[in-house]
A protein has these predicted regions:
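Walker A (P-loop) ATP-phosphate-binding motif of ABC ATPase nucleotide-binding domains
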Residues: 4
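Hydrophobic anchor at the beta1->P-loop junction of P-loop NTPases
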Residues: 7
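P-loop (Walker A) phosphate-binding loop of NTP-binding proteins
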Residues: 10
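Conserved substrate/cofactor phosphate-moiety recognition/catalytic segment
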Residues: 13-74, 120
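NTP-dependent small-molecule kinase module
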Residues: 25, 140-159
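Conserved beta-strand scaffold positions in the cores of enzyme catalytic domains, especially
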Residues: 28-30, 102-106, 151-156
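A glycine- and Lys/Arg-enriched "phosphate-lid" helix/loop adjacent to the NTP-binding pocket
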Residues: 45, 96-144
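Glycine-rich phosphate-binding loop used to anchor ATP phosphates in small-molecule kinases
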Residues: 53-102
């Protein structure tokens, strides 16, 4: 039976790197939010409000695609941040709609480690988006640690 793999972690915690690993390990289709946003909305995402508006549009199209892939027997790794209760409810709903199991991979790293990785990532210039320290702080304030009480199967990663 196919599985939906979800990712939860602060900015620069390693979600996309883990998504690539999981995709290879599970012969899964990997769908990543950042490249979609960068390609569909070049130069339009200048604030968190812009991100939320554009991300919501993508999710409206992506949801049925993910459910269809899962129903067709394809493992899926969604490199979309499952960092808030609302996001996790939407993502979990995709697995439920397809009638398949899920696994939420939680990258548990402290803010200092993530911020250092963000600075290194920004210096290399290879990521679709370069968050500032202020954006990191703003987005991190909304981060909510996942809980099994949400109906989630959680695998914790600490590196």
């Amino acid at each position: 039976m196919p599985t939906l793999h979800l990712l939860c972690g602060k900015i620069a915690s390693g979600k996309s790197t883990l998504a690539s690993t999981l995709s290879a390990e599970h012969a899964a289709m990997r769908l990543s939010e950042d490249p979609w946003l960068a390609q569909l909305y070049p130069g339009e995402i200048l604030s968190v409000a812009d991100y939320l508006r554009c991300a919501q549009r993508i999710r409206g199209v992506l949801g049925p695609l993910v459910v269809g892939l899962l129903e067709s027997g394809v493992n899926v790794v969604l490199d979309f941040p499952a960092n808030t209760l609302a996001n996790r409810q939407w993502l979990l709903g995709l697995a439920q709609a397809a009638g398949v199991p899920h696994c939420l991979h939680y990258l548990e790293l402290d803010d200092d480690t993530c911020r250092a990785r963000l600075h290194a990532r920004n210096a290399h210039g290879e990521h679709d988006f370069a968050a500032t320290d202020a954006e990191f702080d703003l987005i991190t304030r909304h981060f909510c640690v996942p809980s099994e009480e949400e109906g989630l199967v959680i695998e914790v990663h600490r590196s």
